[in-house]
Design a protein with these regions (language model features):
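Active-site-adjacent structural elements in enzyme catalytic cores
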Residues: 1-182
Length: 182
């Protein structure tokens, strides 16, 4: 740490509910990118910020993704390098005796166990879905739709040259209709 690990801890008294969604816990993350660290340092205080995407949409890995999702809804974008990985941070609840992964990410349970020298559990809502709603994800980004891009998908099968021609035909058609292609 710093890096793609968010730790859920008990919030301190006086911390505004707006930063915790009214919960008695708060997620703390210290980014490892230089531009994010410089922004935090320049602010001179902790920064409470959501992900730079519309809820339920895939997380952005490039500034252009943020522009595509939030253009006209935000005042500015601090543009840095593209993300090194397209996976969210691992969310680890450390409020109890046993750390619990609430959202898997690039940092694995095994890596955390090696550092902490203790067993880490994975939240049951991560491992299976319940039809009765009894298992609810405790971390953002764990909904099925979160990882589904908003796009139509067409499967084209067959001989390579025919597949290529059909892709080119569909591309041209969609461009004529004003649809985003690429």
């Amino acid at each position: 740490w710093p890096g793609p690990l968010t730790m859920v801890v008990k919030k301190k008294p006086g911390m505004p509910d707006a930063t915790t969604g009214g919960l008695d816990t708060v997620g703390i993350r210290l980014p490892d990118t230089q531009i994010a660290r410089e922004l935090i340092e320049a602010a001179g205080c902790p920064i409470a910020a959501p992900s730079a995407n519309i809820s339920g949409r895939p997380s952005p890995t490039k500034a252009q993704h943020v522009i595509d999702d939030l253009s006209g809804k935000i005042d500015a974008i601090v543009k840095g390098d593209d993300c090194r990985v397209g996976i969210e941070s691992t969310v680890l609840d450390v409020t109890g005796d046993t750390p619990v992964i609430l959202r898997p990410g690039i940092i694995t349970a095994e890596q955390i166990e090696a550092v902490l020298d203790k067993k880490v559990e994975i939240d049951p809502a991560v491992l299976k879905q319940s039809t009765d709603g009894s298992l609810k994800p405790k971390a953002p980004g764990m909904k099925y739709k979160h990882y589904a891009p908003k796009a139509d998908m067409v499967v084209i099968e067959g001989q390579r040259d025919k597949v290529k021609k059909e892709i080119e035909r569909l591309k041209g058609l969609n461009e004529q209709l004003g649809n985003k292609v690429g």
